[in-house]
Amino acid sequence: MKLAYEIKKEEAVIRRCYDYGSEAELPEQIEGRPVTELAPYAFSAHMEEGALERDIRQGRLRLWDSCGAGDGRAEEFPVSGGKNLPPALTGTGLTAVTLPPALRKIGAYAFYNCSRLRYISFCGELTDLGAGLFTGCHAIRELELRLDADGASCLREILIEVPEKLTVRLEGSVKAKLVFPEFFEESVENTPARILVIHTHGSGMNYRNCFYDRKFDFRAYDACFYHAKAEEDFDTVLEMTLARLMYPEQLLPEGRAAYEAWLREHAGQALEKSVDSHDMEALEYLAGLLAVEERAEALLEQAASRAVSLEFPEGVSYLMDALHRRRKERREEKREEAETTGKAEITEITGKSKSRFEL
């Protein structure tokens, strides 16, 4: 990977990325200086190439090469066509990007029309987001945010920019996995008043407002669960529920009870979906949660049969093992119950005999 960059006030600003791949992992430093800014239209195919060429000719831009030693090496930018330069990583060519920890600013329309971009990793230091940053980026599905001890970030601003359903992984000072449902806004004309009224659909906006002072509020997120149950499809609610239970960062007892109650109510469907998606992590969690249920054996048998039909050997193996353990536990419970009942009957008979003797 090669980067066109410039140095401003002892900090590196990335102007363009060149690579044969589809994923960009930007360096923390260039020439020993922290990378703090991504220029406008940096990953967009709509950048005015004339301006870029002019900066090249004037010597304002240099080239960073990831193949160099250490943090890469700085080179003079090849002005005449750049025969050794990979194609610009822009537009539909970009699928994932990892931003450096010191990055504070992203210029306007930096990812404009990157329609295949699915994954973005960034840090809490990022505070300045340009206009139209994710315009045309409708494929984004996953965000990873690395937080420092303060916990503040620009996550809400990014969530508002991307209305589609998103999975967010929090790392650093907190570790959590969160699912934010989609939302969309509709303009409805109020003719008598001569105004347009904005109607918001979906519970996604409720969840995107679970922030206070740029910090995520887990309690507010969990309090919105009734919105999701009423407005979202089963798959989305299942993803949200499993994410909170499997990564229970700051999950209060009442929140856990609400999620577990919903999961037990839809246990069969939840197991079925986990088998269909070959999700071993979810399958193991569900099997453990439902192990104490009276209908656990029937649920595990159904899930195992489905795993067989879908040619999911790892799932079949785990489910059969869980079923074996459950049956063994049931046999032990029945044996203990029988022993307890037998002892009670013996005690009762002994007591009656003793009473007759005393009389």
What are these regions (language model features)?
Residues 250-252, 256-271, 275, 304-309, ...:
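A cross-kingdom feature that marks long, compositionally biased intrinsically disordered regions
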Residues 259-265, 291-301, 314, 324-334:
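Ankyrin repeat arrays, specifically the small/polar loop and inter-repeat linker segments at the C-terminal end
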Residues 305-359:
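Charge-dense, extended regions
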Residues 285-290, 319:
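Conserved hydrophobic site in ankyrin repeats
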Residues 1-11, 18-36, 48-105, 115-128, ...:
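Structural signature of tandem-repeat unit edges
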